[in-house]
Amino acid sequence: MRINPTTSGSEVSTVEKKNLGRIVKIIGPVLDVAFPPGKMPNIYNALVVQGRGNEQTNVTCEVQQLLGNNRVRAVAMSDTDGLMRGMEVIDTGAPISVPVGGSTLGRIFNVLGQPVDNLGPVDTNTTSPIHRSAPAFIQLDTKLSIFETGIKVVDLLAPYRRGGKIGLFGGAGVGKTVLIMELINNIAKAHGGVSVFGGVGERTREGNDLYLEMKESGVINEENIPESKVALVYGQMNEPPGARMRVGLTALTMAEYFRDVNEQDVLLFIDNIFRFVQAGSEVSALLGRMPSAVGYQPTLSTEMGYLQERITSTKEGSITSIQAVYVPADDLTDPAPATTFAHLDATTVLSRGLAAKGIYPAVDPLDSTSTMLQPRIVGEEHYETARGVKQTLQRYKELQDIIAILGLDELSEEDRLTVARARKIERFLSQPFFVAEVFTGSPGKYVGLAETIRGFQLILSGELDGLPEQAFYLVGNIDEATAKAMNLKT
């Protein structure tokens, strides 16, 4: 892995002033810069704009196009307010580089790898460029194993692959960010894993809430910051498209160091991968490229592949990536979510219908998929239980029109039994979360895979047909459901 001994590309003091250009044009966050003949910077090089005289205007840009006539077009990583034509621009001679390693844990960074949490500078001289090629095929690890999350609906019906890529699909307000926070919490506590969280183009308030939640739950250790389990990298909604487009790569670069150098298993969370595409679309238009379907950039598949192919498992360690995917207007055929689908090992689809019923997590058990749900990987018992649950829920879905028109009484005895079990299963798929204790009033539950399988087997077998369906709502394992049923009877 290529490591640069310098600090962030934005700090001018570390840059030799050997290649100077001047701004000739500014269009919002895009700058055209002229350089002397024969001194053109490479694509992806970081450029730093210097203020005139005593002005402190250190704006870092990234070269995106070579225009000819000794000019390049670059995209700014921060606001371009105050920039003027004629200002001096320094070519740093390398891509943006960010700090990596254990000292990044417990800290919040921006796209340039600068800490933004007011806790002082990062104690490391080890940095890494955000642009690098994906691992070679010969380095990849191809073993298949399940990554247990402690969330019943996920582990049973759409299990995650260790070192795989998982998509959380859903419209606005159905619980993607809460699910991501719960996964970070469970993974830190149950697996002791290191996580990197990339906040790409989401709300600043959510980033702040997540940080405070992590401090409360001990994922970030305030007393001893290096003992923390997560590094946070934020490029929020209010930032220019250049920052939102590159913040995912900054987070990935930090995760790659833990995988390749520290040889650890890492969790990379990206919230939200759609905003990465959206930022690319904005930049593409500013660079003058012709838009393709639905106004997206023509390079959509290439950009997505460039990011996703670096998220993989090698013989040294693994990166398991969980990516929230906002689905515009709940349309799964939109080019952004459709392009993301191609790279995923598992999909967790959140349903507005389930959220409306108050069933959280609102994971759709029929739409969510996983390449891991095969008998040779998960075992016959798990596979048959999951298949039985899906068949029961599918039959319930088919019967809903008849129930709506004619009522339950018109169904056959067998169908009435199927409906009763399906409603119990639907409620048992809900679960109280640690990070949502404030909303649910119930303490969070981590449910192991064996317990999950046992619970659903009991419902499918008919052993629990006599229990009321509300006993299965917002509980952990099946023993809690039977205890709750006893309380309801008294």
From Swiss-Prot:
Keyword Aminoacyl-tRNA synthetase: no
Positions contributing to ATP binding: G170, G171, A172, G173, V174, G175, K176, T177
Membrane-related topology note: Peripheral membrane protein
Reaction catalysis annotation: ATP + H2O + 4 H(+)(in) = ADP + phosphate + 5 H(+)(out)
Key words of the record: ATP synthesis, ATP-binding, CF(1), Chloroplast, Hydrogen ion transport, Ion transport, Membrane, Nucleotide-binding, Plastid, Thylakoid, Translocase, Transport
Biological processes annotated in GO: proton motive force-driven mitochondrial ATP synthesis
Disulfide bonds: none
Top-tier EC class: translocase
Xref: InterPro entries: AAA+_ATPase, ATP-synt_VA_C, ATP_synth_F1_bsu, ATPase_a/bsu_AS, ATPase_alpha/beta_chains, ATPase_F1/V1/A1_a/bsu_N, ATPase_F1/V1/A1_a/bsu_N_sf, ATPase_F1/V1/A1_a/bsu_nucl-bd
Single GO MF annotation: ATP hydrolysis activity
Enzyme Commission code: 7.1.2.2
Biological role: Produces ATP from ADP in the presence of a proton gradient across the membrane. The catalytic sites are hosted primarily by the beta subunits.
Protein name in UniProt: ATP synthase subunit beta, chloroplastic
Species assigned in the record: Ipomoea batatas
Protein's gene: atpB
